[in-house]
């Protein structure tokens, strides 16, 4: 009986080693094409959320099969809806939700509306309102305004900053807009 076990142990170890190698082959790094596809699908799912608007900002990072969600939202349910939508995408195994829910504040709500009117009421900026969700997002936290997203030109970026900075009750304006050269 001892000789059978002596031969069986190395054979078992060999099979376990081969199975581990096959499993590791199945866990390859995602290809660049699959990463680009995932990025496009994540963006699509986020912008299609029903309550996503100009006062919310989503950012995300795709790393392999993990998606990290970041940004700011005005409604708590939008944070959870974003996570649910991204989890349903084929190829996403894990979602880290780092989205900040902005505090409720009547003063911040007033500033949001005033900054929106100041930016999008300008004759040079009206074309941005033709989009379902304008590309310049207005984030207000405790009286501080953050402009996020994209502007078509450097002039639009600067004009948005000047308009937001001229609103009464705004403590500061941080212009995080990038110029979209497409």
Task: Please describe what each predicted stretch is.
Residues 2-10, 14-182:
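N-terminal targeting leaders
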